[in-house]
Amino acid sequence: MDMKHSRLFSPLQIGSLTLSNRVGMAPMSMDYEAADGTVPKRLADVFVRRAEGGTGYVMIDAVTIDSKYPYMGNTTALDRDELVPQFKEFADRVKEAGSTLVPQIIHPGPESVCGYRHIAPLGPSANTNANCHVSRSISIDEIHDIIKQFGQAARRAEEAGCGAISLHCAHAYMLPGSFLSPLRNKRMDEYGGSLDNRARFVIEMIEEARRNVSPDFPIFLRISGDERMVGGNSLEDMLYLAPKFEAAGVSMLEVSGGTQYEGLEHIIPCQNKSRGVNVYEASEIKKVVGIPVYAVGKINDIRYAAEIVERGLVDGVAMGRPLLADPDLCKKAVEGQFDEITPCASCGGSCISRSEAAPECHCHINPRLGREYEFPDVPAEKSKKVLVIGAGPGGMMAAVTAAERGHDVTVWEADDKIGGQLNLAVVAPGKQEMTQWMVHLNYRAKKAGVKFEFNKEATAEDVKALAPEAVIVATGAKPLVPPIKGTQDYPVLTAHDFLRGKFVIPKGRVCVLGGGAVACETAETALENARPNSYTRGYDASIGDIDVTLVEMLPQLLTGVCAPNREPLIRKLKSKGVHINVNTKIMEVTDHEVKVQRQDGTQEWLEGFDYVLFGLGSRNYDPLSETLKEFVPEVHVIGDAVRARQASYAMWEGFEKAYSL
């Protein structure tokens, strides 16, 4: 496909704004914000870098109209005039980089974290948010005041030189979305009840914003084309409302889908969802309005984006995570350099998930995210002979980074292929997109001249003979089998070996020990692989020949896995009849039985299993580094060889250590 002459990369006029192309950067929470409402340089850099990469517009999320009601702790704001100059500096940087800045103007409403300050969040009705704070139903007078605040924030955005603003009434979320959705709005006055009444807040918000900006200043509106919940707003509701939003002053509709609490996977579609999940709704809405309509939601392939725009289904696309993975996505696409595009696998592992170790937005495959200009693409001061031991995600990232900096890089891999434990992760249904990472890194490695030796078990003697100036140890991890009573007396089967295909489970009763990603995906894979014939030992015939039990010591399954992946998988396991035991400690095992201790201290035997699989995670494997330090000038240990964690840490550490050589 010739992207340079595609409709996707043709200009689009929206009011006074001329976009260079029809790819926008969707709003995403970065958690780089400042306590005073200003835009820190680190946050601004993210958007400036995507502007440099050719994105048509960049949208910063959650710019609040009232700092008393912050969205996520630190929240960017346009609630007072003194913030306009610094916001103008931000907008000017984006413009100089070739794009335009669009702030998403919001009042978080029920989603405000003000409850931690002993201030009740505001909402159309009393609702409990994710922080277990109950919102206070606001009065008519408060509604009018808040509407005026939206207008003033819109004015400030235009004064700051922003190309447009975006308003958010999707996902039954934040204040406007909560008013619009019957799932949240239980009012019985003129702002509740009927669809027209529920839309009143949104329409008045749009009208007030329009009154406070120039007549042709663009106002974008994000909506859920379908809330995809029983009792929620439907596509038919949005087909009715979309022309009303246009008449109120909206210049462009951005069509998302789903609701925040009932189905986050519809808002942030990850590995369990197909691409373009909201394109159908967007295309139907486009038929009833005369303004541009953009689709958003797992549009993670630029060629697919070009296809749906070329077919006239939508006027443009908003891409989020793919632009985190590769800020130069648009430039590379226009130049036809598709192999050069760093692929987003929709994993949600670092951009959506947060942890104590990584509380901000990161990207598995792009270690530069959040530090856009800290690691320039320049050669190393001196070219070194570098050995990387292990070709998993961390080893591959290290090899690529070192070679692209001008080092002479050799990779030794004990297996017959690259990928490491990622080869196990992609076995589970819906996770095959992660194979793109290894394809991409392999392409870059070969282009940079990396030399590979497979089926090569590294020894100190061989390393000494090679005489590298630096070694990066990326030997990964081995399956964890704790010294539980019985493990020495019976053959131990691991989930890792099952996922590797070392044995199959055609039918029978299966107990998987553990409740993390490996264990749950093993259960899922076993169910998918089972033969469909009825198995007649009293098991649920609806799931075929197999009956699966999970035993997890923690209070819930999939701790640490992002919600858009976690919740659908748990629902799937339950729907397939998997017996889930949480708060349950493993005391003893045989090859057919498991003795467990419940939370109340009682113990019992779970019996009659044909297979007992250990899926309790991994432990680091590093047999060489200490010896190598005796004769290699530089030795760096990365990833699971340090401590078993998710692949992102291996790739970040591989990048950083290789860049430092």
Curated annotation (Swiss-Prot):
Induction info: Induced by cholate.
Gene Ontology process terms (BP): bile acid catabolic process; lipid catabolic process
Residues reported to bind FMN: Q104, R222, K298, G320, R321
Source species, domain of life: Bacteria
Pathway: Lipid metabolism; bile acid degradation
Activity regulation, short description: Activity is inhibited by sulfhydryl-reactive compounds, acriflavine, o-phenanthroline and EDTA.
One of the record's GO molecular function terms: FMN binding
Major enzyme class: oxidoreductase
Active site: Y173
Residues given in the record as [4Fe-4S] cluster binding sites: C344, C347, C351, C363
Residues where FAD binds: G394, E413, Q421, K431, A458
Record InterPro entries: Aldolase_TIM, FAD/NAD-bd_sf, FAD/NAD-binding_dom, NADH:flavin_oxidoreductase, OxRdtase_FMN_N
Binding site for substrate: H168, C169, A170, H171
Presence of keyword Ribosomal protein: no
Gene Ontology terms: cellular component: cytoplasm
Catalytic reactions of this protein: 7beta-hydroxy-3-oxochol-24-oyl-CoA + NAD(+) = 7beta-hydroxy-3-oxochol-4-en-24-oyl-CoA + NADH + H(+)
Enzyme Commission number(s) from the entry: 1.3.1.116
UniProt KW Metal-binding keyword: yes
Cofactor(s) it depends on: FMN; FAD; [4Fe-4S] cluster
Keywords assigned: 4Fe-4S, Bile acid catabolism, FAD, Flavoprotein, FMN, Iron, Iron-sulfur, Lipid degradation, Lipid metabolism, Metal-binding, NAD, Oxidoreductase, Steroid metabolism
SUBUNIT field: Homotrimer.
Its biological purpose: NADH-dependent flavin oxidoreductase. Stereo-specific NAD(H)-dependent 3-oxo-delta4-cholenoic acid oxidoreductase involved in bile acid 7beta-dehydroxylation.
The family this protein is said to belong to: In the N-terminal section; belongs to the NADH:flavin oxidoreductase/NADH oxidase family.
Protein name per UniProt: 7-beta-hydroxy-3-oxochol-24-oyl-CoA 4-desaturase
Organism the protein comes from: Clostridium scindens (strain JCM 10418 / VPI 12708)
